[in-house]
């Protein structure tokens, strides 16, 4: 089997206007970025308001492992399969961040014969959306320090500035810095730090905004500092929102690309699910729903993170509701959750598979607790044995009364996921229950955190450090107590310990810090050792990425 990059380069791509025709998007509504990428015009999107919406399919996964699960690959394969069985389907994905591309993960455009293309452009600069978000965030940072430099009329307390800087890169050296050094002309020295762009509240606002007006209003609500008498200061107070909206105007238009089979995909926005809310933009999702029978979208990492936030944050704010949910699992990842070392995964091990099944079992039960119908998509790898697949299907049937379907979209494209597509349609067109949430917004923030920890993570309780407790009390006092919560924790475990695999129970969820995201409309809860600025691994992917003798990129996949 050729590599992902070889498969992508061998593909014959359709002109983007032909892809747009499948969704009924006219040429005049496209802003082309070359032959195979386009943005969809704001005015055309506004014209869709009030149109009936198709069915929404959410793709999530078990707790990820270094073995890889293939959630994006499954999302693409499922979208292609739905088109193959006669449904007009579009995929809605997040844009990749440069940090993971050059760090540990590599590219994020699917794999094998289930990819979105042109994948090199998608994985790198794409249409410049992340640059626009980084620039808007940086403009706000500059305006804050400029306001303080010129007399500080708002009486901002330089010890209580919450607005950190961002860059779309994994760079641990920037987590904590000193700024404005070098003399009076450079401003007032203070401690500062950088987060990765995908953790920026601008990114969250970008992905939750309904339109440009909503974007600007949300930006204005962002709390960036406190005054000396402990009153909140917003971006509207420093008059940043108009210029920031100008920088984001074109970026807010969704990006249209295609799969290897020529089917449409909207790729827009990219918050991580372990340190942000992990969903693509509301604008892209709504656009897909108004243009297609089925919109297939993914939520980052496992269902305890991305799917929970998709429901408790994105669906709560927008009224969206998935008609069916696919939980992606792999034989090898379940064996890792059952205690097998990565180097031993190729050997058949039914005992470890059954032990690791506890992870999938909890994710399925968690998704069902929201009132959503579930099917398990088993992403097939060539090392898997027939006995392992048979045992997993048996476990799903007997212990969960849920169907598990082996999918071979990586090797076969949409044809390898037709059975999954049929199951998704059956669930989506079947009986639907009301959507329920993990908590009610009327409860205190601490109660919301505890509800997620105990109901979804299997924890005995939460443990809030004193700094976080003080900040939470302040949020309640300032009127932010009814906001939902966005849990920032390791993606590798239901606990805050990334080495605790499977389905641990009875642990404590440690809350180290909290951050207010008033514009996005949630409180970020930082648990355990999770960082909002990742670092590079000992051997980063960047070590092997280069241009070959023909000027083509090598090593991105």
From Swiss-Prot:
Sequence positions that bind ATP: 65-72
Pathway: One-carbon metabolism; tetrahydrofolate interconversion
Protein's name in the database: Formate--tetrahydrofolate ligase
Family named by the database record: Belongs to the formate--tetrahydrofolate ligase family.
Catalytic activity: (6S)-5,6,7,8-tetrahydrofolate + formate + ATP = (6R)-10-formyltetrahydrofolate + ADP + phosphate
Originating species: Methylorubrum extorquens (strain CM4 / NCIMB 13688)
InterPro entries per the UniProt record, alphabetical: Formate_THF_ligase (IPR000559), Formate_THF_ligase_CS (IPR020628), P-loop_NTPase (IPR027417)
BP GO terms, sorted: tetrahydrofolate interconversion
UniProt signal peptide: none
Domain of life where this protein originates: Bacteria
Principal EC category: ligase
GO molecular function, one term: ATP binding
């Amino acid at each position: 089997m050729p590599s992902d990059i070889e498969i992508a380069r061998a593909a014959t791509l359709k002109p983007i206007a032909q892809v747009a025709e499948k969704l009924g998007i006219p040429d005049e509504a496209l802003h082309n970025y070359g032959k195979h990428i386009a943005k969809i015009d704001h005015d055309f999107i506004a014209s869709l308001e009030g149109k009936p919406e198709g069915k929404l399919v959410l793709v999530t996964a078990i707790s990820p492992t270094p073995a890889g699960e293939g959630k994006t690959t499954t999302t693409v394969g499922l979208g292609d399969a739905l088109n193959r069985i006669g449904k007009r389907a579009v995929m809605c994905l997040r844009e990749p961040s440069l940090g993971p591309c050059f760090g540990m993960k590599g590219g994020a455009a699917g794999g094998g014969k289930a990819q979105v293309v042109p994948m090199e452009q998608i994985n790198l600069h794409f249409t410049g959306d992340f640059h626009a978000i980084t620039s808007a965030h940086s403009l706000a940072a500059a305006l804050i320090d400029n306001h303080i430099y010129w007399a500080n009329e708002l009486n901002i307390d330089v010890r209580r500035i919450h607005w950190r800087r961002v860059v779309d890169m994994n760079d641990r050296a920037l987590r904590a810095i000193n700024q404005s050094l070098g003399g009076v002309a450079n401003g007032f020295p203070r401690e500062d730090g950088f987060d990765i762009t995908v953790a920026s509240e601008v990114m969250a606002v970008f992905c939750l905004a309904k339109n440009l007006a909503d974007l600007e209003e949300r930006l204005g609500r962002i709390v960036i500092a406190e005054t000396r008498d402990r009153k909140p200061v917003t971006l509207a107070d420093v008059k940043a929102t108009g210029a920031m909206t100008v920088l984001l105007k074109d970026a807010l238009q969704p990006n249209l690309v295609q799969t290897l089979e020529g089917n449409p995909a909207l790729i827009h926005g990219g918050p991580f699910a372990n340190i942000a809310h992990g969903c693509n933009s509301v604008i892209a999702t709504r656009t897909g729903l108004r243009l297609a029978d089925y919109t297939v979208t993914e939520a980052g990492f496992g269902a305890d993170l991305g799917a929970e936030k998709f429901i408790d944050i994105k669906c709560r704010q927008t009224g969206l509701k998935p008609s069916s949910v696919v939980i992606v699992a792999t034989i090898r990842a379940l064996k890792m959750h059952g205690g097998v070392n990565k180097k031993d995964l190729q050997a058949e091990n039914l005992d470890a598979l059954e032990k690791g099944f506890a992870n999938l079992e909890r994710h399925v039960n968690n998704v069902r607790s929201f009132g959503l119908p579930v099917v398990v998509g088993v992403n097939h790898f060539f090392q898997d044995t027939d006995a392992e697949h048979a045992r997993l299907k048996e476990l799903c049937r007997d212990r969960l009364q849920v169907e598990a379907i082996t999918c071979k979209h990586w090797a076969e494209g949409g044809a390898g996921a037709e059975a999954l597509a049929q199951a998704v349609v059956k669930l989506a067109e079947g009986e639907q229950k009301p959507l329920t949430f993990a908590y009610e917004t009327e409860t205190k923030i601490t109660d919301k955190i505890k509800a997620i920890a105990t109901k979804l993570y299997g924890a005995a309780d939460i443990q809030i450090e004193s700094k976080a407790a003080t900040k939470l009390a302040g949020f309640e006092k300032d009127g932010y107590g009814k906001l939902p919560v966005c849990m920032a924790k390791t993606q590798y475990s239901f606990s805050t310990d990334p080495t605790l695999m499977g389905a641990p129970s009875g642990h404590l969820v440690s809350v180290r810090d909290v951050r207010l995201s008033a514009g996005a409309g949630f409180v970020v809860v930082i648990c355990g050792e999770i960082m909002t600025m990742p670092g590079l691994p000992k051997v980063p992917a960047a070590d092997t990425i280069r241009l070959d003798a023909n000027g083509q990129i090598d090593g991105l996949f």
